[in-house]
Structure formats: C-alpha cells, structure tokens
C-alpha cells in the first residue's frame, strides 16, 4: 500500500531546488530548524548512554535540513525521500559542506524491510502522505527493540487551521499557498489509536509555538498547532491514553 500522494510530490518537485534558500519557500523550516535539532538531539542523548554508533533514519528528508546537520555532528544518518530531485539537492549540499550522509531515493515501503534503526525521524511529512496509518506503522516497524521514533506534524484544530493555513499561507506568506490540506492534519489521539495494536507507545508530546513578541519559535506544552511526538516500545506500566 503506497503512501505516495502524487499531487503532493508535484508541488514539492517544483521547488526542490530551493531547499537551502533561507529566504525561499522553505524559509520557515530554516527558522524552526534550530529548535527541531535541539529537541531531537536532547531526546537521543537522554535515551542512549552511548551515541557513537547509533544509526538514524530520516524519512521524507526533503533537501536534508535535518539529516545533514545531524550527520555533521557525528551521527550515522540514512535519509530517504520519494523525490529524486530532493535527494540530488540534499546530496549536493552535503558534499559541498564535507558532510557524509547516506541519501537514497526511496519510500518507506521500498526500504529494506529487515533493516532497523536506533532512531527514526519523520518531520513535517505525515500530513502530506496517503494511507497515513500504514505509513506510521511502517515507520515504527524500522525501530530497533530499544529504539525510538520522533515525528512532528500539525494538529487538526480550529487554531491550527487559522494559524497554520490562513495566517501562515495567506497572511504572512511563510509557506506557499495550498501547502497544507486541513483534512490531512492529525490529532495526537488519532496516532495513539493507530498504534493501539502495536508494541509502540507515545512517550512524549511537545508543542512548537511562535512567540510574536520575541519573533521566535520555542518548545511549549501547547500542542494545538505544531507538535513533536516521541515514540518507543511499550513498558509494563499502563500507557496513558491520549485524548487530544
């Protein structure tokens, strides 16, 4: 069952050359990237005592905005994307900056099924795919027994519709118009339900919010719009139900 949404691929292919232009269509990702990296590294280093040999998989890596900086810090990173043009952009940037990343044009379905990773990352991707439950199950299917996954996406709330679409796309122009489809936003509770019959549970939810007074992005307990989700194996204790 494919997760590919051809219309989404067509949208991103048109701008795939522009991933590293901080003033271009992906400018907002550059602005939140320091916070994303900080969160990911904090989760990894708090989960693992020894990070020297960890294998990381970045799914839907785009132009490599996460994969390349992680690899530059010494992590062993494999990064995949369905678009060859994204992989070419990511590979070129990494090579020009002397960073080694294993970039592959692939979908999660095409990836070697028995290859497992210590950390699976998927940022701002699941709101752009088809068959989202199977996509998420495929993601967590590549986690090692003691591994973890970090996902980020947008909540399906009225607040997210106003801020994530009307304001971000049409008022401030942070992202191109029609980048997002509100119906494809996911509530954390829906992901919780998708994982009910697996051995994976939600370990943490953390919001990412914009502070207009300081003109900066920061982590928050407010998950009404953008949020991170950290996943791992279920423990013996009862998994807290996610209802939001």
From Swiss-Prot:
Q: Which residues bind S-adenosyl-L-methionine?
A: 36, 60, 81, 123
The terms under GO molecular function for this entry are: 2-polyprenyl-6-hydroxyphenol methylase activity; 3-demethylubiquinol 3-O-methyltransferase activity; polyprenyldihydroxybenzoate methyltransferase activity
Keyword Transferase attached: yes
Query: Which keywords does the record carry?
Result: Methyltransferase, S-adenosyl-L-methionine, Transferase, Ubiquinone biosynthesis
Superkingdom of origin: Bacteria
Disulfides per UniProt: none
Functional pathway: Cofactor biosynthesis; ubiquinone biosynthesis
Record-linked Pfam families:
Methyltransf_11 (PF08241)
Its recorded reaction(s) are: a 3-demethylubiquinol + S-adenosyl-L-methionine = a ubiquinol + S-adenosyl-L-homocysteine + H(+); a 3-(all-trans-polyprenyl)benzene-1,2-diol + S-adenosyl-L-methionine = a 2-methoxy-6-(all-trans-polyprenyl)phenol + S-adenosyl-L-homocysteine + H(+)
Q: What is its EC number?
A: 2.1.1.222, 2.1.1.64
Q: Does the keyword Mitochondrion apply?
A: no
InterPro entries for this protein? Methyltransf_11, SAM-dependent_MTases_sf, UbiG_MeTrfase
The stretch of residues making up the signal peptide is: none
User: Which SUPFAM superfamilies would you find in this protein's record?
Assistant: S-adenosyl-L-methionine-dependent methyltransferases
Summarize the protein's role.
O-methyltransferase that catalyzes the 2 O-methylation steps in the ubiquinone biosynthetic pathway.
Entry's NCBIfam families?
A: UbiG
Regarding protein family, the annotation reads:
Belongs to the methyltransferase superfamily. UbiG/COQ3 family.
PANTHER family recorded: METHYLTRANSFERASE, UBIQUINONE BIOSYNTHESIS O-METHYLTRANSFERASE, MITOCHONDRIAL
Q: What is this protein called?
A: Ubiquinone biosynthesis O-methyltransferase
